[in-house]
Amino acid sequence: VPHDHSYPHSVAHDHAHTPATGAIADASARIARASDAPAVGLVQAAVWRDAYAHVLPQDVLDQFDGPTFARVWRDSLSTPPSARHVLLVGCAGEQVVGFAAVGPSGDIDATEASGEVLALGVHPDARRNGHGSRLLNAAVDTLRGRGFDTASTWILAADETTRAFLYAAGLSPDSAFRDRVIDVEGTVVREVRLTASLSTASRSQD
């Protein structure tokens, strides 16, 4: 889920290092701190370059810059859009390798009880180690704990891998879609919305 409405599109210790590969020790998910912003920015840049690699030209991909994303995350953590917005990070030991942002849905048909996974990403080098499932489970628990009874998220219509992952976690398409312009050249991508009742959402397994 590489986009985000309320946080950057995707803050003491600075974990802005290249993600480790191989065996993962002490994997966890937690609420982000302000000092995590540099690491989250780097992860988001890598996630976006990977997600849009077959959609955008290389010169646009090169503009996905960790420090730029980090500045926006730092501002969002210092002054959240609302008390119901939360940024979570996934860690391998002390190293941030993924992130998830949750909050109220901004969709036109949303109610006060409609929550949204606004962003979810794991660094490409750290995937297949359970971080995505751990972050999604933490995101669902966080939304439920803040009084939301549904969760939604938007994904690229062509992203079959993410679609399968979210289907397995209990989300399903609700027929909503949108077309977004994602660069100054006017490139348009289609996104579809997946939703789940938080009373029935299952625990995700990566």
Where are these regions (language model features)?
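Extreme N-terminal starter segment of soluble prokaryotic enzymes
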Residues: 26-28
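Conserved GNAT acetyl-CoA-binding A-motif
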Residues: 143-155
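Conserved short alpha-helix immediately C-terminal to the canonical SAM/SAH-binding motif I
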Residues: 135, 159-162
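Active-site acidic-Proline motif in GNAT/NAT acetyltransferases
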Residues: 123-125, 129, 157-158
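Conserved catalytic-core motifs of GNAT/GCN5-like acyltransferases
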Residues: 152-155, 163, 167-193
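Structural motif
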Residues: 43, 146, 168-169
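Acetyl-CoA-dependent GNAT
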Residues: 2-5, 13-15, 22, 31-34, ...
